[in-house]
Amino acid sequence: MDILLANPRGFCAGVNRAIQIVDRALELFGAPIYVRHEVVHNRHVVEDLRARGAIFVEELDEVPDAATVIFSAHGVPIAVREHAAARGLSVFDATCPLVTKVHMEVKKYSRDGMEMVLIGHAGHPEVEGTMGQVEEGMMYLVSNVSDVATLAPRNPDKLAYITQTTLSMDDTAEVIVALRSRFPLIEGPKKDDICYATQNRQDAVKSLAPDVDILLVVGAPNSSNSSRLAELGTRLGTQTHLIEDAQQLRREWFEGVGKIGISAGASAPESLVQEIMDTLRGWGARVPQEMPGVEEKVTFSLPLALIQAQTRREGA
């Protein structure tokens, strides 16, 4: 069996930044450090940080007074920021800068008196954070083309759309076409809201999937971008499995298989890919082959407040 590795795969700049923020906070302030929601959607990453003293909570009411709290990469509603400020909590924001970009678009449209349509998945923390940037009733959530048909904005001539950053590019394009067809004056962002890492990983799977007999996507089931990769592989007609780690591999999947493709969602560490390859090689697979792909050079700086805290400590 041959193993073909999608490129790029795994951690994106926003995930790297979020994990570094928790790491640095633990180093500077010691445990416990509170994190609102899983900092990224990967059980292995969360368990590692938890073992080092991070405490993951869903609401700020679970955070004691005078504690340090970190907001996850997915972003938070304005009300959460206000709650933290009112309590005087020490906050470091791990919101991905590309999610923050969407929030800034929301604020601009809101200042212009426009209602908004958010293309996204109900219940996802990024969607909750984005919808929480405006008053209730100012933003409508749609997940697919069918949802567009039932939209009833108060003023169809003053409407804008934004998107969750981790969606299927193809599905989102179809929804945007439906929105523009029904609301010809609808405005949208100058640059696509779907993040570069999501686009690159989907493009890599599109290139890889037709050439393999089975595709493994490494990622958590609650990871939006990982789930979209698995859906894409299936849509392209390739037997596809979304797995969290090597323990979820099943030997019978590979009976009669000649080529195995492997990709990984933006919140999946490369160590998990390596463990999966080790297991497959134990079952007779050959040395993995890296496929050509886009080289990602994007990096995001840490929050200024965290950098300043480290500078003060080093100067003490």
Curated annotation (Swiss-Prot):
An MF annotation (GO) of this entry: 4 iron, 4 sulfur cluster binding
Listed InterPro entries: LytB/IspH (IPR003451)
EC supergroup of this enzyme: oxidoreductase
Regions annotated as coiled coil: none
Cofactor list: [4Fe-4S] cluster
Function: Catalyzes the conversion of 1-hydroxy-2-methyl-2-(E)-butenyl 4-diphosphate (HMBPP) into a mixture of isopentenyl diphosphate (IPP) and dimethylallyl diphosphate (DMAPP). Acts in the terminal step of the DOXP/MEP pathway for isoprenoid precursor biosynthesis.
Protein's recorded name: 4-hydroxy-3-methylbut-2-enyl diphosphate reductase
Gene name of this polypeptide: ispH
